[in-house]
Structures are given as C-alpha cells and as structure tokens.
C-alpha cells in the first residue's frame, strides 16, 4: 500500500512539474513573440521609403513657396506709400521681378502671385524677408526717352565731282564722311599722277643729256680720226723747200 501511494504521489508531482514547465515555456515563448513583433513594427515604422521621401520633398516645397509668397508681400512694404506709387501705374501689386541664378547666369523672371496669397498662404502678414544667395530682388530702371523732331533739318552736301544733294540731319554726318573720304582719295590719286609725271620728265631729261653726251663723244672721235699729227721739224723743212723752189 505504501509503495503504491508513493508511486502515485511521485507521478502526480511529476505531472504538476511538467505542467508548470510547459506553462513557463509558453509564457516565455509568448513574451519573445510579442517582443519580436513590437521590434518588427518599430522597424517598419522607422524605415525610409520612396513614399516618405516624396512626401518630405513636397512638404519642403510647400514651405518654400509659403516663405516666398510671404517675402513677396513684405518686400518694399510701406504704410505711407500707396500701391500705385509702389508698383507703378502699369503694374499690379501681385507681380514682382527677381533675378535668379540659373545655369551660372543671373536671369530676370516675373513672379506672379495669386490674390489670396498676397498676405501669405494663411492670410497672415510676415515681415521676415527671404534671404537667399540664389534670389535677388530686381527693380527696373526708368527709361529716358529722347525727343525726336518730326521735321529733320535738311542739309546740302556737295561731293568731289561737283554734284549736290539734299539729305536729312541724320544722314548728313555719314555723307560728310563719305565726301571727305572721296576727297582724300582724289588728292592721293592727283599726287600719284604728279609723282609719275615728274618721274617721266626726269627720265626724258636724263635721256636727252645722255644722247647729247653721246653725240659729243662721236663728233670728237670723228674729228680726232680726220686730223693728222705732223712733227715740227718736218714742217720747217717743208717751208724751206718751198722757198728754195720759189
């Protein structure tokens, strides 16, 4: 009897221990599963995706546009100056001109803002100016107009060949320059003709002098060839013979 009781008690105790161990294992397994699920959930929430990246870019663009319109509304704002004097009679308050650095060059662009964004996106006035090295506020210069007379003054311009013409004041200077150039050209041509004529005269004089010198040398040579040289003693002897004969 005692042996049977001990066997039953030990088997019951073993079964209780096994139940407790299984409960502990299941609880540990549940805790690990829940921790793994929470960790995976946190990882999935903090993971950076393309969708989040696009949303981030859109939010940055929206904030930049808000700052731009707010700065446009605050630039040049003065309560004592009316809108007509600020923007001119031909321009609207919702239009501004800027210089933007694009491809290495400053370019002028016209920025038009809607009526509901003149005072900001949400209707609030912002006095913070947009300070960016890529954008410069551009104010157009006032163009001065030169008065042009309806009836230009007529001037008479004479050319080098004696012809006269009537021209307006706008083209008189150009015609004067042309006439001066033609006059200079005529003077140069006349000077060249004089120089060429002088060269021909000198050459003719030189030719005549050369020919006269040649004639003189020929005549002298002919006279020298006809004359004969007689010694003095022969001449005296000839005279004595003539006297004796006579």
From Swiss-Prot:
Keywords: Biological rhythms, Nucleus, Repressor, Transcription, Transcription regulation
Subcellular localization, as worded in the UniProt entry: Nucleus
Induction: Regulated by the circadian clock at warm growth temperatures as direct targets of CCA1, with highest levels from noon to dusk. Repressed by CCA1 at the transcription level via chromatin binding and in a temperature-dependent way. 6 hours after inoculation with the yellow strain of cucumber mosaic virus [CMV(Y)], strongly induced in resistant cultivars (cv. C24) but repressed in sensitive cultivars (cv. Columbia). Strongly induced by abscisic acid (ABA). Rapidly induced by cold, but in a circadian rhythm-dependent manner and regulated by CCA1.
Source superkingdom: Eukaryota
InterPro entries reported in the protein's UniProt record: COR27/28 (IPR044678)
Knocked-out gene: effects: Period lengthening of various circadian output rhythms and affected central clock gene expression. Derepressed expression of circadian-regulated and cold-responsive genes. Delayed flowering under long days conditions, and slightly in short days. Increased freezing tolerance.
GO annotation, biological process: negative regulation of DNA-templated transcription; regulation of circadian rhythm; regulation of photoperiodism, flowering; response to abscisic acid; response to absence of light; response to blue light; response to cold; response to red light
Intrachain disulfide bonds: none
GO cellular component terms given for this protein: nucleus
Annotated region described as Disordered, given as residue ranges: 1-39, 151-232
UniProt function note: Together with COR28, involved in central circadian clock regulation and in flowering promotion, by binding to the chromatin of clock-associated evening genes TOC1, PRR5, ELF4 and cold-responsive genes in order to repress their transcription. Negative regulator of freezing tolerance.
Name of the protein in its database record: Cold-regulated protein 27
The species this protein was found in: Arabidopsis thaliana (Mouse-ear cress)
């Amino acid at each position: 009897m005692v042996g049977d009781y001990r066997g039953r008690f030990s088997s019951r105790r073993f079964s209780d221990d096994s139940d407790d161990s299984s409960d502990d294992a299941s609880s540990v397994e549940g805790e690990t599963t829940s921790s793994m699920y929470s960790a995976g959930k946190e990882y999935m929430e903090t993971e950076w995706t393309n969708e989040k990246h696009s949303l981030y870019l859109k939010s940055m663009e929206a904030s930049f546009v808000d700052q731009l319109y707010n700065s446009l509304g605050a630039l040049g704002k003065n309560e004592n100056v009316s809108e007509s004097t600020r923007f001119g009679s031909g321009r609207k308050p919702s239009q501004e001109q800027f210089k933007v650095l694009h491809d290495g060059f400053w370019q002028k662009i016209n920025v038009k803002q809607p009526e509901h964004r003149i005072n900001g996106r949400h209707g609030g006035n912002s006095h913070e100016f947009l300070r960016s090295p890529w954008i410069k506020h551009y104010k157009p210069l006032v163009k001065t107009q030169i008065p042009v007379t309806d009836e230009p003054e007529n001037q008479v311009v004479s050319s080098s060949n004696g012809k006269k013409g009537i021209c307006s004041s706008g083209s008189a200077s150009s015609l004067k320059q042309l006439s001066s150039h033609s006059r200079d050209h005529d003077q140069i041509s006349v000077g060249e003709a004089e120089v060429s004529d002088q060269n021909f005269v000198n050459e003719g004089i030189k030719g005549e002098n050369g020919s006269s010198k040649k004639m003189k040398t020929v005549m002298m040579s002919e006279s020298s060839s006809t004359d004969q040289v007689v010694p003095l003693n022969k001449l005296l002897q000839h005279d004595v013979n003539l006297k004796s004969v006579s």
